[in-house]
Amino acid sequence: MSPLVAATFLLAVLGSYSTAASADVASSSTFPVFTIAKSENKNQVQYVVRLDDHCAPLGPSPVSAYWRMLEQGPRQTAPLLSREVEAYGLASQVVLARQSRGGEVRAVLRALPLRPVTIETSRGSDGACRGLATASIAGAPAHLFNVYVHLKWDGVDYLLLQGWSMDGSHVVRERLTR
């Protein structure tokens, strides 16, 4: 099954049953890396990476996702529901490196299994931890910041991957359709 067909199916079941998932909601040790936005409302799925005091990935599964409920207010959040994990959850993640000033994680989204995301973490010159997601967009590596899901009445019309070029000079976009 193609990633877009899988995403279509998974988004179609979003209106079914509701139970809470075990996703972590943002805290002081989580840092945002990219989002998924949908055409139906302003809410977004925020992907974050949990970091230790050295800005290195914390634990064996440091990447998680939660809802930013922007329709309810700028600071409202909610965990992903178990029925939403297939559409927005991670198929896998592995910590590739932990160092004294950062690290690296490879994560694979269930909806985009052929587009692994590499998250590099580091401490900036201001002393703050940072996470930067890199994925292939339009055939080249780019710093992923958003996946936009354009819905139609019977599922997903297209996905739009958006990221900054590696040199930061322009936005790179790729539209994925069936």
Q: What are the language-model segments listed below?
A:
Residues 149-174:
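Short, exposed beta-strand-loop hairpins at the edges of beta-sheets
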Residues 36, 49, 96, 107, ...:
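Hydrophobic beta-strand residues in large extracellular and virion-surface proteins
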Residues 16-18:
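N-terminal signal peptide c-region/cleavage motif recognized by signal peptidases
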Residues 4-14:
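Sec-dependent N-terminal signal peptides
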Residues 139-150:
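Beta-sandwich interaction modules
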Residues 21-83:
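N-terminal export/targeting and maturation segments
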Residues 60-140:
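Mature extracytoplasmic domains of secretory-pathway proteins
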Residues 177-178:
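Short, solvent-exposed mixed-charge patches
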